[in-house]
């Protein structure tokens, strides 16, 4: 296994990953996240460390698997089984309604965001 190096978030990744592809994936993930919170009732977690960790995980999954799979869930390689875990995952609304945040913590309710500030 190749050595691991840190992304800006402190997450670790395979340094053999094409850095240009990773940078493009990060831009694409950031556009998706901004667009989603603009058109949904949810907000990004006010904790920038959480957002960076999840964003970096989404970007790595995009490079490695071609989809923005939620980094808090296992990617099996079976498209039908993995599809519900593409961000925003199919369970995020239920999780936010129940706890104020989705499982990975990137999306939160407006009330959660207000209380966390």
Model-derived regions: residue spans:
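Leucine-biased recognition of intrinsically disordered, low-complexity hydrophobic segments
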Residues: 4-7
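Short, positively charged and aromatic/hydrophobic N-terminal segments
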Residues: 11-13
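Long, distal/terminal scaffolding or interaction modules
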Residues: 18-117
């Amino acid at each position: 296994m190749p050595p691991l190096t840190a992304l800006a978030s402190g997450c670790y990744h395979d340094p053999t990953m094409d850095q240009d592809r990773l940078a493009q994936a990060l831009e694409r993930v950031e556009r998706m996240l901004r667009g989603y919170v603009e058109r949904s009732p949810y907000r990004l977690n006010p904790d920038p460390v959480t957002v960076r960790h999840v964003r970096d995980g989404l970007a790595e999954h995009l490079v490695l698997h071609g989809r923005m799979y939620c980094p808090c869930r296992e990617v099996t390689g079976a498209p039908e089984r993995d599809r519900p875990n593409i961000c925003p995952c199919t369970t995020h609304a239920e999780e936010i309604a129940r706890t104020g945040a989705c499982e990975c913590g990137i999306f939160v309710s407006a009330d959660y965001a207000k209380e966390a500030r």
